Amino acid sequence: MPLKLTTYYQGSEIPDFPGTNTFHSKELFQIYEETPGYTPLLIMASEDGKPVARLLAAIRKSIRMFPPAFIKRCEIYGTGEYLTAEADKERIFGEMLEHLTTEALRNSFLIEFRNLENAMFGYKYFRSNRYFPVNWLRVRNSLHGIENAEQRFSPSRIRQIKKGLKNGAKVDEARTVEEIREFSNMLRHLYSSRIRKHFPNIIFFQHMDTRLIHSRQAKIFIVRYKDKIIGGSACIYSGNDAYLWFSGGMRKTYALQYPGILAVWKALRDAHQNGFRHMEFMDVGLPFKKHGYRDFVLRFGGKQSSTRRWFRFRWQWLNDLLIKICV
């Protein structure tokens, strides 16, 4: 049966369809669409008029420390969502991937597939479309089969949580637009000063509130001390798993309150209480590079495992060179 691919560039044109993968949802598309610096596209695959799969990509502006300094990169979380159990997932993915590559390279210097659930999925299709793999690491906490989220924490982490609370810090879920604005401004300052990771416009979090938080597909947690937000975390929920997308705390100014630690602790505890099976930390780095954030989250009892990311550059000579190096 021939597969029909439809590409959507406007959220208003996307029909409502079933699915549980937030990273390939209409709601996340609309958040990207409404956030400055992002251009989303969604590919819908259908057979006999029925949707069978979808793949969401977001093109964003990126500033680099080496030429070209300003680029557009296309990011995809996972390898799509498949809506029927009998679907030939890899074949469908192969067709969506070829179509996405053609579409995205018109406006992007780089395409990146990240946070893959199965590192081997779609291998031959990535290779046939001239992508190259880079080994990566993932860290996630298993939350099922334990009495509480703290069961696998290191003893020092437990002590820090108790000290932070004893020293006046309070942790709760953000519930107002003002709290979300203060949280995002605080975290933007932290990311720009010491974390080499993209941080979106404040509008991203405001629309996360209206599109995802109200439907319990996301939450923002805040750490307060004397009515000031000094830390926080943002989580997205997809299927049976939780994902910690952004987190941080003003640890130098408020060292005795351990705001960064409390922000992660609250996210893990809430995910466990709400029955999620895992909490995955979204960006823990390359396997051969010392990574302070990875070392930090591992002390919450998570397990480290190998995965990969797939990349494709627009410049053919550069892409061919990296294929020779990486494959």
Question: Can you annotate each of these PLM segments?
Answer:
Residues Y38-P40, L105-F109, A218, Q273-F276:
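Short, high-confidence coil segments that cap the C-terminus of an alpha-helix
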Residues E75-L83, G94-H99, Q206-Q316:
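Aromatic (often tryptophan-rich) hydrophobic motifs at membrane interfaces
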Residues L110-F113, D172, M279-M282:
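Short catalytic-loop micro-motif centered on adjacent basic/acidic residues
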Residues I59-G78:
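Conserved acyl-donor/pantetheine-binding loop and adjacent beta-alpha core of acyl/acetyltransferases
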Residues P2-D48, V52-R64, L116-R138, H144, ...:
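A conserved beta-strand-loop-helix scaffold within acyl/acetyltransferase catalytic domains
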Residues R91-N135:
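Non-catalytic accessory segments adjacent to catalytic cores
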Residues Y9, I31, A58-K61, F126-N148, ...:
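Active-site/acyl-donor-binding loops of N-acyltransferases
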